[in-house]
Amino acid sequence: LSQRAGGSIGAALAPVVEGSRALLLEVQALTSPSQLPAPRRVANGVDYNRLLMLAAVASRRAGLELSGQDIIVNVAGGFKISEPAADLPLVLAMASSLYNCPLDAEMFAFGEVGLSAEIRAVSQAQRRVTEAARLGLKKCILPETSLEGLKIPKGMKAIGVRTLRQAINAVVSKDRNKDRSEDLAWEPDGALEPG
């Protein structure tokens, strides 16, 4: 992460639990209009079939026009991610690339994406949030169901989402000039901020 350019297009941070520790990894995505009848899908560090499923769900259920796009995804540093908690940041990276819109450099995300584009809770949410806060991150996109009982570190905004479309709309602005996450932000005491 020390070499990470802040606010990169097509890059999102994913807190991944490996054994007894949480790691913050950068997932990267590049979308490009395909010149082929069957657009290419390339997965480095993530399961290829998972990428196919996430691209299909994002296209069909969340309105991302990915069907005519080549999609290349990568986990920086040569890491491999096998847990579904990286689903949400991976799709956010794809949306960022598709709309050519950088994600907030202080934002991280986690959550499993279901076939209906619902965002499902994953285990060890507290560990993920605590590790990200320790590294100075200030904004978290996570499953709404994970907010219950979660201790949000002081100075961090947690944005609970139910659907993939809601998550994308919260962080990727198609006009590239408006940060939508403020509309949905939760303060540590759980009070909804005015939008």
PLM ranges: what are they?
Residues 1-195:
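Peripheral, non-AAA+ core regions of ATP-driven protein-machinery
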